[in-house]
Amino acid sequence: MRIGATSDLHGVLPAVEECDIFLICGDIMPLNIQLNMPKSRLWLQNTFIPWANGLPCKHVVFIAGNHDFWFERNGGLELDMYNMFHKPTDGKLVYLHNKSWEYEHEIEPGVFKKFKIFGTPYCKQFGNWAFMREPERLEAKYAHMPSDCDILISHDAPRLLGLGEIHERAWAGEDAGNPWLADEIMRKQPKHCFCGHIHSGCHGIQEFNGMKFSNVSLVNEDYVVSYKPLYLNV
């Protein structure tokens, strides 16, 4: 199965290669409307959903991030999310609000392999942004990650392998990764982990203890597109 992954679009909708599943690890909304709920909804309906529905893939699986205030307010309303994203796209768009989704991929005629994807928007606290929680609540949220998770998409970067290390501007050299997310990853051992949030965190694929990791932010710390979506076979 070929997957693509990106994060931190901030309103930029990139060209996407053909793949089976395309993953988006949060911070979808344009910065200039992130606090405006009516404009955010209109942008999702009139711009994001048509773009995602037209991508050359079977499914687009996405989560929210700390700039996605509309999802902080509405993302937990499962029926509303179903009617807004799933129903009008015949199931192509899948929004995960700290939950799992399973996909059966046909690896050869009549033979299917199941993949379990868990997505969480929750981040460690740093300012007054969406989905930021104190450690005890983060631990409770991350505990929902299944022990048989194949693919993890998180907005926050775990404090592992430099995924959350800032490489640009005044904070360069600081590891802003999330230790509570890292702890849960080490407990549950998902096979593939994709994140964003720390725009200049370590991109490319890294391997540790049989797991593969990548920060897939599209933009740099100045919110300028500096990276491309990542593609790999799983």
Listing of model-derived features with the role each one plays in the protein:
Residues 10-11, 29, 67-69, 122-125, ...:
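Short, solvent-exposed loop/turn segments at secondary-structure junctions
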Residues 102-113, 180-192, 199-234:
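Binuclear metal-dependent phosphoesterase catalytic core
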Residues 6-107, 177:
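Core catalytic region of metal-dependent phosphoesterases/phosphodiesterases
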Residues 1-3:
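Extreme N-terminal starter segment of soluble prokaryotic enzymes
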Residues 112-151, 171-179:
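Binuclear metal-dependent hydrolase catalytic cores centered on His/Asp/Glu-rich metal-binding motifs
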Residues 29, 34-44, 79, 127, ...:
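Active-site-proximal segments of metal-dependent phosphoesterases and phosphodiesterases across multiple
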